Amino acid sequence: MDSRTMTLIQAIVIAILQGATELFPVSSLGHAVIVPALLGWAFDPHGEIFLPFLVMLHLGTAIALLVYFRNDWAAIFQGLRGRDGSQRQAESIHILALLVVATIPAVIIGGLLEHWLRALFGTARYAAIFLFLNGLLLLLTERMKSRQPVQGGYAIASLTYADAAIIGLWQCLAFLPGISRSGATIIGALFRGLNHEGAARFSFLMAQPVIIAATVREALHMRHVAIPPGQMQVATIGAMVAAVTALASTAFLMRYFHNHERWALSPFGYYCVLAGAVSFFILGH
């Protein structure tokens, strides 16, 4: 196989991983680095030649999130059209502003450090280490939260701009391959007073501008990349698989967090600890 191309089976596997791990708190970037290495695939999934594939995966994931949260966005934008000074309009403006504030740290820190961090820690063994640490962080969070009364807070509008900025800083941990973006932001939101369901909803709403921005940025770079024959068709299939997987993952997780308040992140934490440790051992041999 040409190491510059991706087979359809490889594309489907990576697309399923992207669609699931982008939302589950287990790190999509970490899995994208570790899984090809474990399977002995020759390609670099983050190489320039695979930009079309990454663009389409992110596009599929973004569409899935927009479809699932269409009612949330519709309520926000309908609220913006309300009467000047109405409570609904003020709440809609506040939620949009929260999302903007929460995105700013990733834009600044990502612009300054993302490429450096991924160049420094972008190997599969580093990803396995950070995946292990991601699991410990999830487990530690649930242990700390178990000592507190059950949170009743669900309303995203109850967050302050300082809360949003702090959650945005948590998101920046995900520039390290193996640290989950959704996991980090859910943890940040939990510590700012939301319950698991509210934290997950805010995390997934935050993800949409970030993923769309990444898609646009990668699409602009794609103009200068020579795409091997047939790879655009493979990328399109990957996008559809990622979209379906992301939609199913989002629906499952929102229902899961609605029904589980205590220790909700623990199963994902145990998975990350085990997967990180096993991957590190295998890759070391």
Swiss-Prot record:
InterPro entries, alphabetically? UppP (IPR003824)
Report the domain of life of the source organism.
Bacteria
Q: Does the keyword DNA repair apply?
A: no
Arranged from A to Z, the UniProt key words for this protein are:
Antibiotic resistance, Cell inner membrane, Cell membrane, Cell shape, Cell wall biogenesis/degradation, Hydrolase, Membrane, Peptidoglycan synthesis, Transmembrane, Transmembrane helix
Task: Quote the EC number.
Answer: 3.6.1.27
Q: Name one GO biological process term.
A: regulation of cell shape
Q: Disulfide connectivity?
A: none
GO terms for molecular function, please?
A: undecaprenyl-diphosphatase activity
Where is this protein localized, as stated in its record? Cell inner membrane
Reactions this protein catalyses: di-trans,octa-cis-undecaprenyl diphosphate + H2O = di-trans,octa-cis-undecaprenyl phosphate + phosphate + H(+)
The record's principal subcellular location, in a coarse class, is membrane
Q: What class of enzyme is it?
A: hydrolase
Can you tell me where the transmembrane regions are? 12-34, 49-69, 93-113, 120-140, 159-179, 234-254, 263-283
Q: Does this entry carry the keyword Repeat?
A: no
Membrane topology field? Multi-pass membrane protein
* Cellular component, GO, one term: plasma membrane
Signal sequence annotation: none
Q: What role does it play? A: Catalyzes the dephosphorylation of undecaprenyl diphosphate (UPP). Confers resistance to bacitracin.
Q: What else is known?
A: Bacitracin is thought to be involved in the inhibition of peptidoglycan synthesis by sequestering undecaprenyl diphosphate, thereby reducing the pool of lipid carrier available.
Q: Which family does it belong to?
A: Belongs to the UppP family.
Q: What is this protein called?
A: Undecaprenyl-diphosphatase
Q: What is the originating organism of this protein? A: Gluconacetobacter diazotrophicus (strain ATCC 49037 / DSM 5601 / CCUG 37298 / CIP 103539 / LMG 7603 / PAl5)
| Record gene name | uppP
